[in-house]
Amino acid sequence: MSKNKPVTGAAVGAERTKAVADLIEKIKDGNAEVRTKAWLGAGEVGWPAVSALAEVMTDANLEVARAAKRALWKIVRHAGRPGADQERQSVAVHVNSLLAGDKLVAVRREALWMLSEIGEKGLIKPIAGLLTNKELREDARMVLERIGDKASLAAL
């Protein structure tokens, strides 16, 4: 984009869509070096890539699935850096959407642990809702303990 032209919402959206598509293409690449470089740079892509990466986490190719998981963690940790409150909130909301019952347990479990690093007080209720889930209750309990504020501990 030219620095002299105003940036429109459509232009930003197109850039984000392209960045996500490029990231997913590289995560799925057959070359391990390409995949590694992709997941290492995923933090800059941010929240727009969360749901696409979660889908790739279930890929039949274990190395591709692992690269997608690493990319998601990179995004979470990048968003959790000091001074990135708005980015952290956006990523947390999108990671929270991965807790939905239509996702595989492995994806939901990983999302829980990601929220333990960037969890918002507003996300305690959905996490606490998983305390009744047979497959995820222990993870949900530990995540609430890890968040450790009064609201999360009261949810236990």
Which ranges hold each PLM region?
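Conserved beta-strand positions that form and line the central face of beta-propeller blades
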Residues: 26, 52, 94
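Active-site metal-coordination segments of metallo-dependent hydrolases
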Residues: 60
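Repeat-mediated protein-protein interaction surfaces in helical alpha-solenoids
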Residues: 18-21, 91-95
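Structural detector for internal amphipathic alpha-helices that build alpha-solenoid repeat scaffolds
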Residues: 2-15, 33-47, 52-55, 63-86, ...
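A conserved position within tetratricopeptide repeats
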Residues: 27, 57, 98-99, 131
